[in-house]
Amino acid sequence: MRKVRVLALVHDHLVPPDDTTGIDVLEAEWKMEYDVIETLREQGHEVRVLGVHDDLAGIRPTAGFFQPHIVLNLMEAFAGITTFDQNVVSYLELLRLRYTGCNPRGLILARDKALSKKLLAYHRIAVPDFTVVRYGRKPVLPKKMQFPLIVKSLFFEASAGISQASVVENAEQLARRVQFIHESLGTAAIVEQFIDGRELYVGVLGNERLEVLPVWEMSFAKMPENRWRIATERVKWSTRYQKANGIMTDAAHLDASAIAHIHRMAKRAYRALDLNGYARIDLRLDEQGRAYVLEANPNPNLAYGEDFAESAEVYGLSYEKLLERILTLGLRWEPERTG
């Protein structure tokens, strides 16, 4: 692609340092931002970084003098509030700035795990049975829901608040875990039928025409038999815990028909939730071979070596080409023509 000016919007505490001498970048919390920004620079693109926390005022003047062709949106929250991420993108649209990633409507639909499941179910895409427990309320289960269940935040991503205790097997455990979500994360809780099986991820790229990346699987080779095989916060973010339990991700070993079915589900979910740019669809595959969509993540981790980039590599997109594909999709997206 042609060389472009890129304004990278990142959380202010995740702005990579200019000099990384003596720093273990692999363990840095800003690794994704560093990987993306430096790779684009190495490709010849001019990248300016702007850290944002609770004020969007800096975007307009910076865009005014820098004149970016596109904004690289790496924001996942605003002022620490995850449900405000769509407002950042809405502001970019009002400024008539091209941007990478998902549109505001898709962010809203995907962020709410209950609303997204209702939409998916309407489109006859299999999802686990669920109920929502609003903040401060006690759980009341529909008759069709049976233990074990899994309790999550209605809005948070990145496995926030998920641990082995999230899978509950009786009413007492359920009440305790719902209270934990309410008090520790300050959000409503979603209680889902627990799907015992394989943890799968599918990356999707595109606006109208979609490309589906290879099905990826999280495996738990050394996990004790009495532990639930789920993507907890420790599983996702603790390298020590990953090594101790043989947790890794790689291309899923499935037959061609299963892969084709899961790919179709991922594409249908992507379209049903009005996503664009790129996203990851999370699924579970039960012991009978039935796949269920758990949720969609419209801003997956783009760090080098992470699931999305690794599956793109297997698909035939190098890390450099993946990032340029994401830029190209953002440049081609026309928000005023949607709906």
Where are these regions (language model features)?
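Active-site nucleotide/adenylate-binding loops and adjacent lid/helix of ATP-dependent enzymes
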Residues: 1-10, 64-67, 107-198, 209
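Phosphate-binding site of ATP-dependent enzymes
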Residues: 171-264, 287-292
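ATP-dependent carboxylate activation and anion-phosphoryl transfer catalytic cores
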Residues: 119-121, 253-339
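Short acidic, glycine/proline-rich loop/turn micro-motifs
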Residues: 17-22, 160-163, 306-309
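ATP-binding N-terminal substructure of ATP-dependent carboxylate-amine bond-forming enzymes
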Residues: 1-100, 104-105, 109-111, 122, ...
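A short beta-strand motif that forms the metal-chelation/ATP-contact edge
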Residues: 6-7, 72, 201-206, 289-304
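Hydrophobic beta-strand scaffold residues
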Residues: 47, 98-99, 127, 149, ...
